[in-house]
Amino acid sequence: NWKVYPGDVGYDSGHTWIILGQCKDKSAVIVHSTPNAGVQISGTPTPSGSYSSQAITLAQKYMSRYAGYTKYDYHTSSGNYIRRGNYFRWNRSTLSDPDGYLNMTADQILADLFN
């Protein structure tokens, strides 16, 4: 199935990430932090392992706007976070979604956040 939702918190041994949104090809745009480059947006490959994913393309589009993209050599592709780790999902009756992100794709969410 490989369905993730905006706001899902993923984790495994030694790393944590937040899902910003999922693309139609089932890849996901995540936000995470690295020791050398700080907080960054990355895209995952598709669940089948293709690095020609919509999420990686979106991460490159948005991260290339910032000086750190070149200065810190941001990696806009990440490991296959869709298939690894565990996820914490917010209780829909507890946490509201005033912007409607739950029903948006990653490209719609990023356009809203960055425009």
Predicted ranges, named:
Residues 1-46:
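...with weaker cross-activation on analogous glycine-rich loops/strands in unrelated enzymes
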Residues 47-115:
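Low-complexity, Gly/Ser/Thr/Pro-rich intrinsically disordered linker/tail segments
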